[in-house]
Amino acid sequence: MTRPTWDQYFTKIVKVTSERSSCERLHVGCVLVKDNRIISQGYNGFLPGCKHNSIVRDNHEQATVHAEQNALMDCAKRGVSCNNSTAYITHYPCIICTRLLLAAGIKEIKYLTDYKNDELVANFCEQCNTIICKLL
């Protein structure tokens, strides 16, 4: 058996992380990695402590927190810096999550699945010298 590459390893982990999602429409996971060590994980789900009441507007769930946001908030709560780290995400990030990842100092975004790929995401990454790439 061959040893998986780091990308293969974290790809498996982010897929399993997404399985924790309580969202019926889409299961998204995010794993933040620094120096090949996981510093945080998150998945999309309802607000902590709140009932799982779905509120959909314009085909988008309003009552959930995105996976990337949950991973970043976990770092903030625990006082862990994610500066110069890599985000492994199951789906192409939205504009808001991209802005948050970039503001937090994420230097590489690796995603598995195309999802409403907005050109602003790539534009913001380029402006911030952050690599965004799809893993096969």
Where are these regions (language model features)?
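Zinc-dependent deaminase catalytic domain
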Residues: 1-136
